[in-house]
Amino acid sequence: MPRIPTVELSRYLLTGHIASPGCLRARAALPGKNTRVALGGAPLPSRQLQPRQHARYLTTETSFANPSATTSSPAAAAPFRKQLKEQAKALKKSGHKKKKSSDNQTVPGWELTVGIEIHAQLNTAHKLFSPATTSFNDPPNTHVAPFDLALPGSQPLFQPATLIPAVRAALALNCSIQPVSRFDRKHYFHWDQPSGYQITQFYEPFAKDGFITLYARDGIAAEDGEEIKVGIKQVQMEQDTAKTTAQPGDVQWLDFNRVGVPLIEIITLPEIHHPATAAALVRKVQMVLASVDACVSGLEEGGLRADVNVSVRRTDDPSGKLGTRTEIKNLSSFKAVEDAIIAERDRQIELLEEGGEVKGETRGWSLGSTETRRLRGKEGEVDYRYMPDPDLGPVVIGEDLVARLRETMGVLPDQEADQLMERYNLSAKDALSLMLLDGGARIQYFYNVLDSLEERLVADGQAVPEGAEHATLAANWCLHELGKLTDSASSSSCSDPDVLEGLAMTPLGESPLVPSSSLAAILHHLYSRTITAKVAKDLLWAVYRGEIPEGGTTSYIDTHGLWFKELPEEEYAKLADEVIQGEEKILGEFLRWKQGKMKAYPQGKLMFLVGKMMRGGPEGRVEASGAERVLRRRIEEVYLPELEKGE
């Protein structure tokens, strides 16, 4: 057997470069172009520190330096949500209309069956089998240990601390923790896995037999009723692979910072029968993992990846056997999960109705696609040759650790959603949006704002008010008004150079662009009726643009004379009389309501007139609730009696 030249072996191990495809010993070139693989792009970059965002792991410090020190990378891709918006615009322009999701959950005569595999990066300080620290934003190849590169003589060293978020995640998913689990080798060769195998837990995972309950508020299909329970077969620990970035000229850049980062793979039972329910499950799992601080980031940020197995069968099939399944790999958004399942279901049904046969294969899905694409067939599947890892002993998890983690679990998403709806009077949609936004950080931001707001009310000599009015105000602003900032920022029609994109929210629920204390100061004045809602919104924009420093809200209001000087009652009444003139048709609706001819109070018409009062009154002196109160009293006590007399 020929000996591999030392130079060739070194170039592969240290830089990931292979001069020719195929076996290094045979050096047999394959037809077609060669693909060059560069470790982070040519030579190993220096360890010069670069700016990065705050990593999810809270003990990891952020490094700062001149960004020009690194090798330039391709221009950043447009934000994921912006890509979806652009594609929606293109579809609308072309006149192509998609079915509503709610109309596309079933096909008469056919049953869909879906199983899901979710891979989630764990929130840990170190990699799974090396002392190298985890990194998600640092320069490429600066967090790499010898074992991560499979250098000769290096051995795996299991890091026990990685068990903590893994067990916490499994408990949150109602799994049974196994006292003993073992690691196996999954063999395959690819440039993103230097050792030629991945260490996983194929035979003896650390957690089994769990379940997750989905409710109507989670977005499940209407056909599934108010709730559905989906079983979880197992949860296993495994290594992540290197991050591959395609470059022009058939070049792949490899970042080995990600090699060996601990993952958990969550495998559900095939108990899902509607596409919307599958997407809801992935969304719910992400929320559960974030709530117990087990996962680094969400689906759209790359910290969570989903594969789905799809099969169909006729509902009148006497055998009752499931159809042949296909697997769709690496779905990167909740919408992609639902759309890909619908497309693959329809493809399989069409094939079977034409007399064809569904083949077991792996398929792919691209953003904005209308159909799945074939990646490889069953005959092309790799024989992974699973075998126990001889270098790693069994993992023993004590009942004392399990009990301790169960006691310190904290509030899970269902409990938190119930609290937001019952205590703060939020709708189910708003509660879930708060919990999902910014990778789960928006809900913490809301609590920070609420705490700061209540401190200010107490400092004013007020007791923390009973009921949920102030909390509902804070929640609505944290969700809707902050949402308007980011919507405007991401809009392609927004040309304001001062408008930034996103809120740069940290895992601790803070935003350097809109600090929670600044929003609380605005809401304190709004709740106390010392500024109007319009002024409050203008102040929020000023904070976002950096015009108001943290702690400077009150002085800014003073300097610009923005304090609310409310009109006296008689001025409100005069303004109400002015807007009512000529609105006999609207007054007629109020009269029909009073006479019992209409069930619902015409609130929309009332607010239309309030809007006229706001626009017609002195700038900054008309307060909406005061205008509504006076207007309603004038209509019911003055104008309706006059109309009744005239009948």
UniProtKB/Swiss-Prot annotation:
Basic residues bias locations: 90-100
Region (Disordered): 87-106
Keywords: ATP-binding, Ligase, Mitochondrion, Nucleotide-binding, Protein biosynthesis
MF term (GO), any: glutaminyl-tRNA synthase (glutamine-hydrolyzing) activity
Family annotation (SUPFAM superfamilies): GatB/YqeY motif, Glutamine synthetase/guanido kinase
InterPro entries: Asn/Gln-tRNA_amidoTrfase_suB/E (IPR017959), Asn/Gln-tRNA_Trfase_suB/E_cat (IPR006075), Asn/Gln_amidotransferase (IPR018027), Asn/Gln_tRNA_amidoTrase-B-like (IPR003789), GatB (IPR004413), Gln-tRNA_amidoTrfase_suB_CS (IPR017958), Gln_synth/guanido_kin_cat_dom (IPR014746)
PROSITE patterns: GATB
One GO BP annotation of this record: glutaminyl-tRNAGln biosynthesis via transamidation
Protein origin, superkingdom: Eukaryota
Any Pfam family hit: GatB_N
GO cellular component: glutamyl-tRNA(Gln) amidotransferase complex; mitochondrion
Reaction catalyzed: L-glutamyl-tRNA(Gln) + L-glutamine + ATP + H2O = L-glutaminyl-tRNA(Gln) + L-glutamate + ADP + phosphate + H(+)
EC number: 6.3.5.-
Stretch forming the signal peptide: none
Cellular location(s): Mitochondrion
Family that this chain belongs to: Belongs to the GatB/GatE family. GatB subfamily.
Function: Allows the formation of correctly charged Gln-tRNA(Gln) through the transamidation of misacylated Glu-tRNA(Gln) in the mitochondria. The reaction takes place in the presence of glutamine and ATP through an activated gamma-phospho-Glu-tRNA(Gln).
Record's miscellaneous remark: This protein may be expected to contain an N-terminal transit peptide but none has been predicted.
Assembly behavior: Subunit of the heterotrimeric GatCAB amidotransferase (AdT) complex, composed of A, B and C subunits.
Protein name: Glutamyl-tRNA(Gln) amidotransferase subunit B, mitochondrial
Originating species: Neurospora crassa (strain ATCC 24698 / 74-OR23-1A / CBS 708.71 / DSM 1257 / FGSC 987)
